[in-house]
C-alpha cells in the first residue's frame, strides 16, 4: 500500500509537541512523553511559586516587637529573655525563607538558643508560647532520660519522633518545628578532668546531640525505642529545626563571680571589694562559664544564643496568677462558671499562694498545685449543689486549710455560711 507506514513514527513531547529530533532528551511514561525543555520549564514554574510562597512567609512572619508583644500577653516579666527570644526566632525563620529564595550561595547558619534560669522561672512556658505564636510543631524532651547509643535509655533521635508525632507525621512541618530540651545542665560533665569511667548520660549525650543540633539527616524509628538494622526508618532533616535548651545551672553564678574576681553578696563580702548586683552575673555570663560548668565546647558552639531568666518575685507570681490571657485564676473561674458558680480570690489569698510557691522553691511551676488543692473540695461539691452561687477563697483557706466562704442562692435571697464537708 502506498500509504503504508514503513518506519516507526517519531516520538513527540506530549506537552509542547516537539519531536525527539528537536530536543536533547525525551522521558517516557505510561503513554506520555516529556522533553527536557518542558522539564526545565516546569522546574522554573515550581521554583518561582516556591520563591513567591517563601517571600509571603517572610512578610507574614511576626516581627521581633510583635513576637515580644504576644509573649507579654502570656508571660509575666523576663523582658530581657523575651527580647532575645523574639529576635532569635524571627532571624531563624527568616533564615529558612532566605534559603528557599536566595541563589547567591550565601549561607546563614542556624542559631539555637539556651535558656538559663531557676526552676519555675518560665523557661518551658516561653518555648511553648513561641511555638503557639508561630503555629509550628513543638516537642519537649528531658535531657536526663537520654543516653548515648548502646546504653540503656532513650536515643537522641527519639526527640525527633516526638516532634514528628506532634506534627501528625507531616515531615515537612516537623522539619520547621521547635524542640525544647529541658534539664540540659544535668548532662554536664561530672568534672573538668577526663575520667577513666564512661559518662554515658553526660558528655556522651552532649556528643550524641551535636549532629542534630547542627543539622543532619537523622534516621528516626517510627515506633520509638532503640534502633535495629531490620527496622524501617523515617528520615528527618534537622537543619531547620530550632532547638531551645534550658536548665537551672545551679552554681553557675559563682563561676561567673569567681571569674570576675568578686565575692558572693552578703556576710561573706569583705570591705573594699566590689559588690555584685543581683543580675550582674547574668550580664557577664559567657560561653566559657558554661564550659567551666561542664558543657563541652563543641556543644556550646552549636548554641550561640544565651538568654538568662530572673528568679520570680512574689509580685511576679501574683501577676502570673491574675494577668495573662490564660492566667490560673481565670482558668478556675471559667471552670466553676460552667457550673454557674462565681469564684473569687481575696488579695490575701493570692499573696499566700505566691509566698507558698516561693517557700517551696517551685516558682511559677508550683502555683497550679497550690490553687488546685485549695479548690479540691469546692470542685467536688459544686457540680452536685445547684444552690451554690459564689465561692470566695481567703488567706486562711491557703495557709490554714480553712473552709472557703460560700454564698448560697435561696429563694432569691442570699445567705452566706461556712461550707461543711
From Swiss-Prot:
GO cellular component: HslUV protease complex
GO molecular-function term, one example from the UniProt record: protein dimerization activity
Domain ClpX-type ZB: 1-54
Keywords, in A-Z order: ATP-binding, Chaperone, Metal-binding, Nucleotide-binding, Zinc
One example of a Gene Ontology biological process annotation: cell division
Residue numbers binding ATP: 118-125
Pfam families named among the record's database cross-references: AAA_2 (PF07724), ClpB_D2-small (PF10431), zf-C4_ClpX (PF06689)
Positions of Zn(2+) binding: 13, 16, 35, 38
Origin superkingdom: Bacteria
Keyword Protein transport among record annotations: no
PANTHER family per the UniProt record, alphabetical: ATP-DEPENDENT CLP PROTEASE ATP-BINDING SUBUNIT CLPX-LIKE, MITOCHONDRIAL, ATP-DEPENDENT CLP PROTEASE ATP-BINDING SUBUNIT CLPX-LIKE, MITOCHONDRIAL-RELATED
Family to which this protein belongs: Belongs to the ClpX chaperone family.
Primary role: ATP-dependent specificity component of the Clp protease. It directs the protease to specific substrates. Can perform chaperone functions in the absence of ClpP.
Subunit structure: Component of the ClpX-ClpP complex. Forms a hexameric ring that, in the presence of ATP, binds to fourteen ClpP subunits assembled into a disk-like structure with a central cavity, resembling the structure of eukaryotic proteasomes.
Protein name from the UniProt record: ATP-dependent Clp protease ATP-binding subunit ClpX
Lineage, broadest ranks: Bacteria, Bacillati, Bacillota, Bacilli, Lactobacillales
Amino acid at each position: 500500500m502506498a500509504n503504508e507506514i514503513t518506519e516507526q513514527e517519531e516520538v513527540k513531547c506530549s506537552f509542547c509537541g516537539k519531536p525527539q529530533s528537536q530536543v536533547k532528551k525525551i522521558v517516557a511514561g505510561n503513554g506520555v512523553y516529556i522533553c527536557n525543555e518542558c522539564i526545565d520549564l516546569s522546574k522554573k514554574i515550581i521554583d518561582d511559586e516556591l520563591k513567591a510562597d517563601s517571600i509571603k512567609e517572610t512578610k507574614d512572619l511576626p516581627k521581633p516587637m510583635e513576637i515580644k508583644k504576644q509573649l507579654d500577653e502570656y508571660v509575666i516579666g523576663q523582658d530581657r529573655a523575651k527580647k532575645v527570644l523574639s529576635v532569635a526566632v524571627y532571624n531563624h525563620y527568616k533564615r529558612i525563607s532566605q534559603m528557599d529564595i536566595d541563589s547567591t550561595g550565601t549561607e546563614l547558619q542556624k542559631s539555637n538558643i539556651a535558656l538559663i534560669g531557676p526552676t519555675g522561672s518560665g523557661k518551658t512556658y516561653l518555648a511553648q508560647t513561641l511555638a503557639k505564636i508561630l503555629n509550628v510543631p513543638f516537642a519537649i524532651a528531658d535531657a536526663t532520660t537520654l543516653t548515648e547509643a548502646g546504653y540503656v535509655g532513650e536515643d537522641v533521635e527519639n526527640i525527633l519522633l516526638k516532634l514528628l508525632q506532634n506534627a501528625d507525621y507531616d515531615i515537612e512541618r516537623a522539619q520547621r518545628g521547635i524542640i525544647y530540651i529541658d534539664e540540659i545542665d544535668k548532662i554536664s560533665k561530672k568534672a573538668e578532668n577526663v575520667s577513666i569511667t564512661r559518662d554515658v548520660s553526660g558528655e556522651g549525650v552532649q556528643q550524641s546531640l551535636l549532629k542534630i543540633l547542627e543539622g543532619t539527616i537523622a534516621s528516626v524509628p517510627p515506633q520509638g525505642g532503640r534502633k535495629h538494622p531490620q527496622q524501617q526508618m523515617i528520615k528527618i532533616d534537622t537543619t531547620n529545626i530550632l532547638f531551645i535548651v534550658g536548665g537551672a545551672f545551679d552554681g553557675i553564678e559563682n563561676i561567673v563571680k569567681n571569674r570576675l574576681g568578686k565575692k558572693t553578696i552578703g556576710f561573706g563580702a569583705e570591705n573594699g571589694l566590689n559588690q555584685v548586683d543581683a543580675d550582674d552575673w547574668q550580664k557577664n555570663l559567657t560561653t566559657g562559664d558554661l564550659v567551666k560548668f561542664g558543657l563541652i565546647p563543641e556543644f556550646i558552639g552549636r548554641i550561640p544564643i544565651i538568654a538568662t531568666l530572673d528568679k520570680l518575685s512574689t509580685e511576679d507570681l501574683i501577676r502570673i496568677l491574675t494577668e495573662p490571657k490564660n492566667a490560673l485564676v481565670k482558668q478556675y473561674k471559667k471552670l466553676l462558671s460552667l457550673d454557674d458558680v462565681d469564684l473569687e480570690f481575696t488579695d490575701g489569698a493570692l499573696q499566700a499562694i505566691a509566698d507558698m510557691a516561693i517557700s517551696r522553691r517551685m516558682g511559677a511551676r508550683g502555683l497550679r498545685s497550690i490553687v488546685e488543692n485549695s479548690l479540691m473540695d469546692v470542685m467536688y461539691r459544686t457540680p452536685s449543689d445547684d444552690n451554690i452561687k459564689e465561692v470566695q477563697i481567703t488567706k486562711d483557706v491557703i495557709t490554714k486549710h480553712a473552709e472557703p466562704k460560700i454564698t448560697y442562692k435561696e429563694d432569691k435571697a442570699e445567705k452566706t455560711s461556712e461550707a461543711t464537708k
